[in-house]
Amino acid sequence: MLDIKFVRENPEAVKENIRKKFQNAKLPLVDEAIALDTERRQAIADGEALKAERNKLSKANGPLFGKLKKCTDEAEKAAIQAEIDANNAAVKADAERMAQLETKKEQAEAALNKIMLVIPQMIDSSVPIGPDDSCNVEVQRFGEPKTPDFEVPYHTDIMERFDGIDMDAAGRVSGSGFYYLLGDIARLHEAVLAYARDFMIGKGFTYCIPPFMIHGNVVEGVMSQTDMDAMMYKIEGEDLYLIGTSEHSMIGKFIDQIIPEDKLPQTLTSYSPCFRKEKGAHGIEERGVYRIHQFEKQEMIVVCKPEDSKKWYEQMWQYSVELFRSLDIPVRQLECCSGDLADLKCKSCDIEAWSPRQQKYFEVCSCSNLGDAQARRLKIRYKDADGKMQLCHTLNNTVVAPPRMLIAFLENNLQADGSVLVPEVLRPYMGGKERLVPLH
C-alpha cells in the first residue's frame, strides 16, 4: 500500500510501475485516487474553516451578552439580541455544514482506501520486467543436479514402498488435497521441521508458535484481496480466517505497535499448519503432496528499519540455500519478474529444488521484501533517533515446507535399491538412522 502523498506527487511513476506489472486496467485508479484525495483534503480544509468561524461566532456572543445585561434601552437591547440570535443561527448552520463535510470526508476516505489497497507497491529497480513467471530469471545454482542411472518413481510411489502415505483414506475422511503420513515418512516429515527450527534458532531467530487463526483486518493488512480470495478459508459466522502461512500471524503480532528502535530488527521463525484453497490452481504436479489444502511449514520473518531490508533480503534467501544444501538437495535461485510479484511485494525470489525424476527444478521456498506495504496497512512503526515516527519494513521467507521438501528429499536421496539415505544433519532427529529401508 502506497502513501497517498507519494501517489499525489508522483502519479506518472506510479502509473509506470503499474505498466511494468502488466496491470494496465488499474491505470485509471491513480487519477481516481488523486481526485478522491483532493476531495477529502478539501472537505477537511472547509471543515476547519467552518470550525474556526464557529468558534469566532461563539466567542463574539460573550461580549454581546455582557452588553445586553447592562443595556437599558429597549431598542438597543433588541438590536443586541438580534445579533446574538444571528450568531447562534450561523453557529447552528455551521454545525450542520460541518457534519455534512465530515460525512463527505469519510465517504471519500473509504473510497480512497479501497483504491489504495489495489494499487501495487513500487517494485525495486533490480526486478526483471515480464508479464508472468515464464519471465523469471535464474540467478545462480547451488549443487550439481543429479541424473540417476535408475528410474526415479513418483514421490507417492516412493512413500508407499515405506507404507508412508495413505491418500485414499484421507480422501474418504476429508476429500481431495489431504493425506495421512505414516511410519518413517511421518518421522522424516517431523525431523525436517525440527531440524529447520533448530537451524533458524542457530541463526539468531526467536522461535515462535503463533495463532493459527487471525482476524480479517490482519488478513487485509498482510495480503491483497485477490490473494485472500484465492487462498484463505474463513470460519463461518466468525471474524476469523485459517492462516495460509504463519507469516500472516507473525507479522500481525506487531499490528498498531511502535517498536523501540533498539529492539529492531525483530527476527522470528515459526512452525504452523497452513490451510489453503489453492489445490489445482496451477495445473502442475497435482497428484500427491505437491499442492494440497493442508500442510505444515517453518517460516521466517523480519521486521526492520527501511535501510536494513535489502541486507536482510539477501541474508534470508541464502539461509534457505544453506539449509537445502545441508540436506544434499541441489537448488537454484530464481528472480521473480514484475508480473509474477504479488501487489504488496517490491522484490521476491524463489528457491527451487532439483527433481531428478522430472529433470527440472520446482519451487520449495519464496523470499520476499514487502518494503513498508504491510507496515503501512498494519501501522507497524518505530521512532528514529530524532523522535520521528517511521514505518518499518517487513520480509518473509519459507524455511521449509515438508510436503514439497519431502519430494525433493526423497528423489535426491533415493538409492538404486529403493532405500533413502538420511543426511548426517537429520540423523539425530531420526533416532540415528543413516538409511531408510523400504518395507516392500
What are the residue ranges of the model-derived segments?
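TRNA-recognition modules of translation machinery and tRNA-sensing kinases, especially anticodon-binding
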Residues: 27, 141-440
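N-terminal alpha-helical targeting/anchoring segments
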Residues: 1-145, 160, 164
